[in-house]
């Protein structure tokens, strides 16, 4: 493992560290995110059943008009508010796990997470 670890890029190393922490035996629902240059995706996953419970992205009909040229703070606000709306309809009572993947916890990723936290969801 040590030899393999030396040949990985920084984002791949970060992703491995995060996966190791997420798979530490905690049975919680996971919010996974993915971002590209133009779009932002988030989904709530039940890892025990292997099912996506809900998802939201900048390609949704409600948000698509706001996201014309790429992702920015306004689109993240729209995506997070839509995710909060969908999660509150599900009436979750347990803590969630925030899976940021290989992304650093800065910028749009932290803004999305803080919006969820401010609405009462716990990671």
From Swiss-Prot:
Pfam families: Ribosomal_L18p
Keywords on record: Ribonucleoprotein, Ribosomal protein, RNA-binding, rRNA-binding
Single GO MF annotation: structural constituent of ribosome
Superkingdom of origin: Bacteria
A GO CC term assigned to this protein in UniProt: cytosolic large ribosomal subunit
Signal peptide coordinates: none
Gene3D superfamilies on file: 3.30.420.100
BP-aspect Gene Ontology terms: translation
Record keyword Coiled coil present: no
Family per similarity comment: Belongs to the universal ribosomal protein uL18 family.
Assembly and binders: Part of the 50S ribosomal subunit; part of the 5S rRNA/L5/L18/L25 subcomplex. Contacts the 5S and 23S rRNAs.
HAMAP family on file: Ribosomal_uL18_B
Stored PANTHER family: 39S RIBOSOMAL PROTEIN L18, MITOCHONDRIAL, LARGE RIBOSOMAL SUBUNIT PROTEIN UL18M
UniProt function note: This is one of the proteins that bind and probably mediate the attachment of the 5S RNA into the large ribosomal subunit, where it forms part of the central protuberance.
Protein name: Large ribosomal subunit protein uL18
Naturally occurring in which organism (per UniProt): Wolbachia sp. subsp. Brugia malayi (strain TRS)
């Amino acid at each position: 493992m040590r030899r393999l670890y030396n040949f990985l890029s920084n984002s791949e190393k970060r992703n491995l560290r995060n996966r190791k922490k997420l798979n530490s035996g905690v049975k919680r629902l996971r919010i996974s995110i993915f971002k590209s240059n133009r779009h932002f995706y988030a989904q709530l996953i039940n890892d025990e059943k292997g099912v996506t419970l809900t998802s939201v992205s900048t390609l949704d009909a409600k948000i698509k008009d706001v996201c014309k040229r790429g992702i920015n703070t306004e689109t993240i606000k729209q995506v997070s508010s839509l995710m909060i709306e969908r999660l509150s309809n599900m009436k979750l009572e347990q803590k969630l796990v925030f899976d940021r993947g290989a992304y650093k916890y800065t910028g749009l990723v932290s803004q999305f997470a803080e919006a969820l936290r401010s609405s009462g969801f716990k990671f």
